[in-house]
Amino acid sequence: MPNKSFLFYAACFSLSAYGFWPFNDGDQEPFVFAENGQAKAAIVVRTEGRAAGYRYAANELADYLGKMTGARFAVVEQPVDGLATIRVGTAYRAAKTDELHIEVKSSDLLEITGDDALGTLYGVYDLLETFGCRFYCYDFEKIPTTNRLELAADYVRTDAPFMIHRQQLAGVFCENGNPQVNVFSRKHRMTRELEKTNDFAAVRYLGLQQVLCTYYVSRQKFLDEKKHPESYHPEWYALRMDGSRCPHTLCASNDEMYQQLFAEIEKDIVEKGWREISLGDDDAWEMCYCPGCRKITASDDARGNGAQRVALLNRVARHFASRHPGVRFNILVYGHQCPVPAERFRLEPNAGLSFALLWRNHCRPVACCERIGTDVTDWLRLTDKPVEIWDYGCSFFCNAMPFPNHDIYGENFRFYREIGVNGIFSQVQYSTNGDLAELHHYLFSRLCWDPDADDQRLTEEFVKDVYGPVAKEVLEYLEICRHARDRQRWWWGGCYAGATDSWLTAEDCVRIHQLERRMKNRLRREAASPQRIHADRARISMLYLAGSRYDDMMAAAPKMRVKLPPKGELVEEYRQLFEDGLNRLPWYGELGETFYANACIQHMRHIPETASSEPAGKPAFVRVSAEELDGGERRELKREADGTPFVRLDPKPRGTEGRGKLYMDPSKAECGVTAGAARKGTWYIFGTVRSETPAVSEEAAAYLGLYLFRPYVLDTHTNFPHDEVVNMYIPGAKDMRNWRTYCMGKYRLYEKSRVWVMCGIINPVESVDVRELVFVNPDCFDDEKNAQTFAGAGQVRASKGGRQLTDGFDKFRYWTLDEAALTNASPSLVCTFTKQQAQAAHVFARVRLGATAPKSAKAGRLVLATPATKDKPAVEVASVDVSGNPLDDGWQIVSLGCQRIEPGMTLTFMPGEGGKLRFLDLRSVHLLPVEMFAGKGNGGK
């Protein structure tokens, strides 16, 4: 029998979704569920309406209350004499979809209800969570026990999600023959199963699927002349510029195609009851070039591919508007260019939008992405209706690979709420064998219901409860990953990236390996339990990292006095955990987009068991002049008046010819250098660029990036041999004439890796010029002993409240102004140059800041100035704005150009005009020899 007392009163001081309720006046009796193993209440279930759903909710409540109290709760249709009543499914008028309502009416009556049977079920789970139950994973729940369970007499709670559709493409939520899975998806309040059942609510279909040419007007039926000559209609599909037909896009002007499409949609509405219909393309963004579609495109001032999509959507919507007035039709905006002007392309009242935001850094909040304007904001002008999102939350290269994005869900969902999103479908780690996959699933489900929930508290609670004896190590692992992600601001975590060495150092890998060994040793002493199963699962990504980076670990481990086990032992442990039936192996590579289990193991076995090393005899720097840069078709070698060569990239047209999508094409306006044997190894990478735009300013007029070639790619996964690991956007301005040097950070290059510059495509750009790419040896750049070229924390002074700290992992010193210190007068961090540092040099500052406003171009400011004297005030020599984003807190190396440094000159880092900051940090200042870069005048204003 339970022997712990669990009295719950705290909820009466909580806030509901719509406000707060009165405090207990002290003389009312609480509602008592059970005491000393005896039920004090019976559950009365509603029998009208969706009776099966209400009874399911009542049975769930009875089951969990029984587990908590040891009592047996009756589920009946009428109140029972001598027992209080818990009414499940009372008649209720909900204000919002999926709303729940819980209210203690008296000491004898508690009502749990909501929006239909589903809202009632959510009310049951909400109450159980209030009592401390946690539904973490399909095979792990936390259920507290008590001798007496009661609820305050004035307890009232009303809550509702901001999203109507909440779906994850995850094995623990999909229908796969395991009845536990569907039950679990309800506890996480996911709505995917509502497409298949109406026991709880009306069938609810999320209208953002890729269905055109696959499900509707299927190419298998209408574009396969060999198999189906009788139904062959190539004219129904988009005509390409070369005369071929696109199997992924429909012709938006063919009347016969529309008749077929109308018939197929009508059947689904009538026979399946669908109320939301997707008209999303099949992973495509091509345009049709037939005469009819050319007229549609000509009506669009942007001349992009969006007008044809809108024309198709609106025609379908108009056709069904009177016949099926309650049905909504959506297109899936997947890189399509928004037609202009918005007034000409407004959507029909029964038409809507959904977005697939693929091209972005998925380890930073979505609001940080500079393409949000063209990908989302511009399109929102076409409709006043809520929109839907196809989201991404993992690496498609390998689900087991560490992927540092667990802390961005709340920020993302708050942004989605702000722009009016009411539905989400996310491709997260499909298998529980992913990188702490179930933690990601849990955070996703909690935060897409309530974006304002404390994600840090949710994370810590989950880790401590689920991983139990190894919770400390798991939290340390998350912190290592967060720190590694923030080492360099411009690291880019795309969803196809597979190169962990672009952000995790060899030392990081050894630290994580040590955590995993501690976890393994501790678990040996633990008896079999759900916690142990999940703790072993948590080791999977750590073991994958050790196997895939074993050569790097061999180089770092001796310096850290760590002895590594044989690689084969680690791979075998990984295989055993991966193939354990409890870890859902069959659901790993669900779409062929990720490594399958065996390919992961082969990949690890392919890694050499010899320590990686830097090439011997690396020079201090390698400068690649414009004359040495190769690249795409639209580039031209030109010269300045003084003869300095540069490459001019022609950014017009922005869209890729024949496709209409706005994306950067390496075969067009691109230049760069592909690493050969001479450029292998680790370098700080710089590019000197200038960009001119029609607008006064443009945040992403050009990009400096890195495609990292992976040397151990297997034949099983050659689709993505290059990882895009840096994507640094470069601002431009009208009539820009000055060169600016940009640093993407420090990266290890393999042969065939490519450093590149491309034109931006978000808004029109006049020109992008590239003068050079420079590779600087870290031994030169980070030489703290060279007082002539390196100014560290010892040369910095801070305004009131500033503190000098030591980095917890990399052990460098830096100065910080926290949020409180930034409220003082004139907050700043100032480096003063010495006599020894007097020279002509290219000046760089390594800084970071915590912006609160997305895409803040002027979050901080660096100013180089002469010292003030009795006779002269300080004179600004150069200055530069420092940009920032929320949760984009990485260190960045910022150029102030080639300058003449004199003793006593100062470099000041201060807040800019971009809004409130959470912190402001200065780590070091670097003075590089001018001969590394061509000419003078790089950077500062």
Which residues are covered by each model-predicted region?
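Feature activates predominantly on carbohydrate-active enzymes
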Residues: 52, 56-60, 64, 93-280, ...
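Extracellular carbohydrate-recognition regions
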Residues: 604-651, 774-809, 933-941
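Catalytic domains of carbohydrate-active enzymes that cleave complex glycans
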Residues: 447-686, 693-709, 729-735, 740, ...
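Extracellular carbohydrate recognition and processing domains
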Residues: 714-752, 872-902
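Structured mid-domain segments that build the active-site/substrate or prosthetic-cofactor binding neighborhood
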Residues: 249, 253-257, 267, 371-472, ...
